């Protein structure tokens, strides 16, 4: 089905003004009044319609990733990975698939500067022959928490105070003082990469662990990585202040202007894979979203390239109404038991139904470009005309049948019902290794950002001591330096 077939007629194809229902408007400058100075009449339908439409132009803002920019292009397979997955769009080198990508900041509101220290969203929608595939990630390979139960609390801590409507450091460091698994993510957020130069010069990661399934049903755990061909570049704190003060939409402008000039952004896609039968061979849990997979023992494998060569035509239609969900996969790519991914599978689609309505997948930007059919009918803002009589399954009057079964390896699950943490937490090792990989100047900038966060007037001595203890367990010298700057005695 062509997702654009039932798109409402554009308002730009009439030579004169009309109402939404098509009636001609002979005066779009003045309201209907009694005489020159009399009251406005309620019967001025065009005025009422115009104001009512204006009053409803805005839809609910995304609870996270509100500020964003989109672009369109294609993904091309460059290396054969057919032995790992039966996904049709990865079937052979040379295969191209249309994509739309949305880059975003995470915590801050829709009109916020793009120079604030914040993770960046990196979401890709592939329009494949077997349906859409949404790879919904960030520019950092790990996350703050490993269990989605804490996601609402985490966002609340980052968001402005419900009392003052201001972002306050004491709220952030207080919340995460209870979650040492966040340390690895903070070695990215408080590092120089915490403020990318723009969207073209940043990495992308699927973050969560997915599963690739081959034609013979073999499963491999997989991590996805996007690497920009123009390299990774960042803004230091003082540079961000200058750039943000000059243009608070600098990253959107850079992306739009680059594509318009023919300087198309490009990323290479790599994967890391682990045999699903070998996931217990490491000192970390491969399903733990707070951990990276060491590239020296699990090397990157090239897959393809993505080129963005077309700007969007309408910001509202192709950015604000663009909707992603990690549950949207294709045969050959499946979920894992990653606890954060499991909660995202529900939450993303749920928030889109809240923002856009139950039929958000009918919107042209979200609809698949392949043929599709089901009995999901009606509902708010259902604008696709359907004339079939049979809206149930099965039926002898409707030849539609089940699709061919695609490979899905059987699994035997056993265990007690319980709420618990994972066995291999190992919260400090990778955070310490990353800190030690910084050069001395970069280490000092990282340290100073923590000093700034922990010297907020509301941060207590207890909270400071906890963070000194955490960073000491990552790296003894880092803990000592932080304690010295804070003028407190280290616990270790």
UniProtKB/Swiss-Prot annotation:
CDD domains: catalase_clade_1
Residues the entry annotates as binding heme: 348
GO BP field: hydrogen peroxide catabolic process; response to hormone; response to hydrogen peroxide
PROSITE patterns: CATALASE_1, CATALASE_2, CATALASE_3
Superkingdom of origin organism: Eukaryota
Gene Ontology CC annotation, any one: glyoxysome
Keyword terms, alphabetized: Glyoxysome, Heme, Hydrogen peroxide, Iron, Metal-binding, Oxidoreductase, Peroxidase, Peroxisome
Heme as UniProt keyword: yes
Record field: catalytic activity: 2 H2O2 = O2 + 2 H2O
InterPro entries per UniProt: Catalase (IPR018028), Catalase_AS (IPR024708), Catalase_clade1/3 (IPR024711), Catalase_core (IPR011614), Catalase_haem_BS (IPR002226), Catalase_immune_responsive (IPR010582), Catalase_sf (IPR020835)
Tissues expressed in: In whole endosperms (aleurones plus starchy endosperm), in isolated aleurones and in developing seeds.
Matches recorded under SMART domains: Catalase
Catalytic residues of the enzyme: 65, 138
Assembly: Homotetramer.
PANTHER family (alphabetical): CATALASE, CATALASE ISOZYME B
Entry function: Occurs in almost all aerobically respiring organisms and serves to protect cells from the toxic effects of hydrogen peroxide.
Protein name (Swiss-Prot/TrEMBL): Catalase isozyme 1
